């Protein structure tokens, strides 16, 4: 990457927004000058960003690019291009591919593919099953001997059935995973037992409202509480994916934090734009495009 000076940009910094200059040298930010005034050397490309905002590249912590197995939906190249076009410069991809990515070998193959196809930074979760803890340990290590393999960002656990065949609902299996692995565990938090029971309530229905009634807020909250309990008992790093309800957010208040202490559970979560802007009242207008688990 050539050296670049961006001048007169409205720069979004951690705690404020200021107009100024930003200098990139050898592909890295070298200087940020509120108010401007950076003088570029002759070889440096200069961009006048007056009236424009300058933000850090965004990180999308949950994408489903369906590569390998279903490239007709999206693949690593098209997905990363779409990300880059929207200002997302890093993504973390999920393991419910065809086949599911549940072994270290499959992760190495996926990383090799990404090295040739992706136009952005990337990371991949290895999928947990009820019987693959040894493969998880190969990918992320154990609490006493953590491993950091470039391209592997953590373990994904589906606590409730969703797209694909990955499911870990058994309490003993969950305890084994939380107790015997290192790194980050990210969970799809829906309670499988409650979903099985509530599915009877919507039998025969084909309306979209049935989906939200079946996979309700309480279904998510039960699994969230369960995952946090395992994390706190083992001191594991935990990320609750796609938080969907106010009751979950209220319950997690005081539990989640940006920073964690060594050896203690560190819990984080995320909210997706669609969960902040749509609800069941929008289904009649937009239909199945709003269907998502949870």
Mark where each language-model region is.
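Divalent metal-binding segments
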Residues: 64-73, 89-104, 123-135, 158-169, ...
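A glycine-rich helix N-cap at a beta->alpha junction
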Residues: 112-128
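Histidine/acidic residue-rich metal-binding segments in metalloenzymes
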Residues: 134-294
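Residues at the N-termini of beta-strands
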Residues: 31, 90, 121, 151-154
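Histidine-rich, glycine-flanked metal-binding segment
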Residues: 2-57
């Amino acid at each position: 990457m050539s050296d670049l000076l961006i001048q007169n940009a409205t720069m979004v910094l951690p705690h404020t927004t200021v107009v100024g200059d930003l200098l990139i040298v050898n592909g890295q930010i070298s200087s940020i000058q509120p108010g401007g005034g950076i003088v570029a050397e002759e070889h440096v490309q200069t961009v006048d960003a007056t009236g424009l905002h300058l933000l850090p590249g965004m990180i999308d912590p949950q994408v489903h690019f369906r590569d390998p197995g279903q490239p007709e939906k999206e693949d690593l190249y098209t997905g990363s291009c779409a990300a880059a076009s929207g200002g997302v410069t890093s993504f973390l991809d999920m393991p419910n591919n065809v086949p599911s990515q549940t072994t270290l070998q499959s992760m190495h193959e996926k990383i090799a593919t990404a090295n040739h196809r992706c136009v952005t930074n990337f990371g991949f979760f290895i999928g947990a099953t009820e019987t693959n803890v040894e493969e998880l340990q190969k990918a992320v290590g154990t609490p006493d001997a953590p491993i950091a393999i470039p391209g592997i960002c953590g373990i994904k656990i589906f606590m409730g059935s969703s797209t694909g065949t990955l499911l870990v609902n058994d309490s003993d299996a969950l305890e084994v995973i939380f107790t015997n692995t290192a790194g980050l565990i990210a969970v799809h938090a829906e309670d499988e037992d409650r979903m099985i029971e509530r599915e009877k309530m919507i039998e025969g229905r084909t309306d979209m409202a049935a989906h939200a009634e079946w996979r309700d807020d309480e279904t998510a909250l039960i699994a969230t509480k369960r995952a946090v309990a395992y994390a706190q008992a083992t001191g594991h790093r935990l990320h609750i994916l796609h938080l969907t309800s106010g009751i979950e957010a209220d319950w997690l208040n005081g539990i989640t934090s940006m920073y964690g202490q060594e050896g203690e559970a560190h819990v984080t979560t995320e909210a997706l734009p669609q969960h902040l802007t749509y609800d069941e009242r929008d289904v009649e207008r937009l239909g199945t495009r709003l269907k998502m688990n949870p």
